[in-house]
């Protein structure tokens, strides 16, 4: 299959502009990782001191869990730190233990974006959908059904139709091995919180956000990035969507400039913190008129559901 069309940075930016946009920082990426974990810690502490705030803290922590994924995504492109070893280790230790699995998967997504070989195409292909279908998806996310399906669905499928030479215990052992990083890190977290007498805080303000708010904001991110984007497009400016955000959307849905997805697909060498600058420069040159841009996440959801009922 032919790879997706690409743009040349020099067609859009001066050499000085491109140097500014594509420069990697020894400080900023690591500072963002620290920022993310500090916000998570402050949110959990707030919920412990003022339990009435726990519903809001679930949203804050879930969004920052997505933030860790966003920063791990930058690391998959080698953008978190100019030193590749530091880049990878920082992502593995503090951004997500599945970098080695995610990187080849994600780079294939970029290589064949919105084509049949794109592993993420299944996420955007079903759209448009009806408003009722979207509501059902949101309910599944917020009730933990999506989390359970993603974490335990593959094992359940294998146990339902096992191979003749595989026992249930073998299947369970293989699944535990596949998810050992997730199980180990969360077991350590639970043990530490339990030792501090705060086991309930781990359940309510780490596991619950992971099982509810994180699946929802991850779904909204996927919808905003590629839903209703034309498949097999030869225009590299139309491979993804950028969505403008307000303060509340950045705080509770789209952390660390993940909303500038059109620019990211055009220029994968730009770290996330420079994507707003890239957008501004492109806008000043009239280029954003050629990019799929929506004014808010609500506008995206309205579009992907309205077209289904026309």
Segment roles from a protein language model:
Residues 21, 80-97, 118-133, 233-248:
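Juxtamembrane helix-capping/reentrant segments at transmembrane boundaries
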Residues 1-62, 71, 94-204, 272-310:
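Non-catalytic, topology-defining segments of multipass membrane proteins
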Residues 91, 136, 140, 209, ...:
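Generic alpha-helical structural context detector
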Residues 28, 59, 65-66, 178, ...:
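Alpha-helical hydrophobic/aromatic positions enriched in membrane-embedded helices and signal peptides
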Residues 162-225, 229, 234-235, 243-260:
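C-terminal membrane-associated helical module and adjoining short loops/tails
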Residues 68-77, 102-114, 221-228, 255-270:
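Histidine-centered catalytic micro-motifs
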Residues 60-72, 100-102, 145-151, 206-234:
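Transmembrane alpha-helical segments that form the membrane-embedded catalytic/substrate-channel core
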